[in-house]
Amino acid sequence: MMFNRITRSAGLLARARPTTTAVMSPMTPLAISRRGYHEKVLDHYNNPRNVGSMNKNDEDVGTGLVGAPACGDVMKLQIRVDDNGVIQDVKFKTFGCGSAIASSSYVTELVRGKSLAEAGKIKNTVIAKELSLPPVKLHCSMLAEDAIKSAISDYNSKRKTKNPTLGAEAAETPAAATATA
């Protein structure tokens, strides 16, 4: 009799384990969609665009590294800018939730081909609206906005370091030409 109870008990435990395992298994796209993620988030999460990195020491590359202490998301976004101030290439690496990855992926598509001034005006509300992010995930779109602004700032600081007196030289050039004439 005791043996039967143990067997039954073990049988119940064995049946309970797969349910527990299924709950703890990695999330499939179907499981994610049940949680209410918009199809655009799922698309950018499952097929992220422009993942990678560039050499941060290149003078035409700006790097933005931002994080959200509340949730642990970290986003690195890099831009490559041509001589006309237009973003030619964009790469990102994000460690975080699906919404953070989707926000990063989307913003890389958004800024490519834009001038630095245009890219600097991008607001998180545009990103959040496009991806239909719920209020609890708005910080992900804020990270993307902060990352692009940080990358632009890094690029601009490299340009100033490379040519610290560019403005002064440009101002002196006409005067020097007049003085020698």
UniProtKB/Swiss-Prot annotation:
GO CC terms of this entry: cytoplasm; mitochondrial matrix
GO molecular function terms listed in the Swiss-Prot or TrEMBL record: 2 iron, 2 sulfur cluster binding; ferrous iron binding
Domain of life: Eukaryota
Cofactor(s) this protein cannot do without: [2Fe-2S] cluster
Pathway this chain belongs to: Cofactor biosynthesis; iron-sulfur cluster biosynthesis
Keywords carried by this UniProt record: 2Fe-2S, Iron, Iron-sulfur, Metal-binding, Mitochondrion, Transit peptide
Localization in the cell: Mitochondrion matrix
UniProt region (Disordered), positions on chain: 159-181
Signal peptide: none
Compositionally skewed regions (Low complexity) per UniProt: 168-181
Main location: mitochondrion
Cofactor details (free text): Binds 1 [2Fe-2S] cluster per subunit.
CDD domains linked to this entry: IscU_like
Gene Ontology biological process terms in this record: intracellular iron ion homeostasis; iron-sulfur cluster assembly
Family according to the record: Belongs to the NifU family.
Entry-linked PANTHER family: IRON-SULFUR CLUSTER ASSEMBLY ENZYME NIFU HOMOLOG (PTHR10093)
NCBIfam families in alphabetical order: iscU
Function according to Swiss-Prot or TrEMBL: Scaffold protein for the de novo synthesis of iron-sulfur (Fe-S) clusters within mitochondria, which is required for maturation of both mitochondrial and cytoplasmic [2Fe-2S] and [4Fe-4S] proteins. First, a [2Fe-2S] cluster is transiently assembled on the scaffold protein ISU1. In a second step, the cluster is released from ISU1, transferred to a glutaredoxin, followed by the formation of mitochondrial [2Fe-2S] proteins, the synthesis of [4Fe-4S] clusters and their target-specific insertion into the recipient apoproteins.
Complex and partners: Component of the core Fe-S cluster (ISC) assembly machinery.
Protein name: Iron sulfur cluster assembly protein 1, mitochondrial
Species whose genome carries this gene: Yarrowia lipolytica (strain CLIB 122 / E 150)
Lineage: Eukaryota, Fungi, Dikarya, Ascomycota, Saccharomycotina
Gene: ISU1
